């Protein structure tokens, strides 16, 4: 009796998984809602027959489910990666634009500062040489 209860629990969990996976499968394979309902009824059919064919059907569906989940994880990972790359590229462009604007202003200021610092250096060198001459 415990074995039958465990099998029904497994079947219920598998059905819930297919309900959850249904919309994701539709997006990736562009299938209609009718095909997912056919798949759900197909997965329920073999499991309600004898135990030997039910186990084989369950093994196949769990293998397929595992493969589908891996594919979805890979697909989601690549979409996140693409989003990350787009964000990185856009932030680089924004950083470059921000850096270009202040550079122009800073370069003008540096020239002014350089000329004033040159004057100061010249004056210091004159005072230093005049002090040394004394």
UniProtKB/Swiss-Prot annotation:
Give disulfide pairs as residue numbers.
Answer: none
- Where is the stretch described as Disordered? 21-82, 96-134
Q: Indicate, by first and last residue, each region the UniProt record lists as having compositional bias (Basic residues).
A: 102-113
**Entry keyword annotation includes NAD:** no
Q: Name the residue ranges with Basic and acidic residues bias.
A: 57-69, 114-126
Q: Where is the composition biased (Low complexity)?
A: 39-54
> Which stretches are tagged as biased composition: Polar residues?
29-38
Keyword annotations of the record: Malaria
Q: What is this protein called?
A: Rhoptry antigen protein
Organism annotation? Plasmodium falciparum
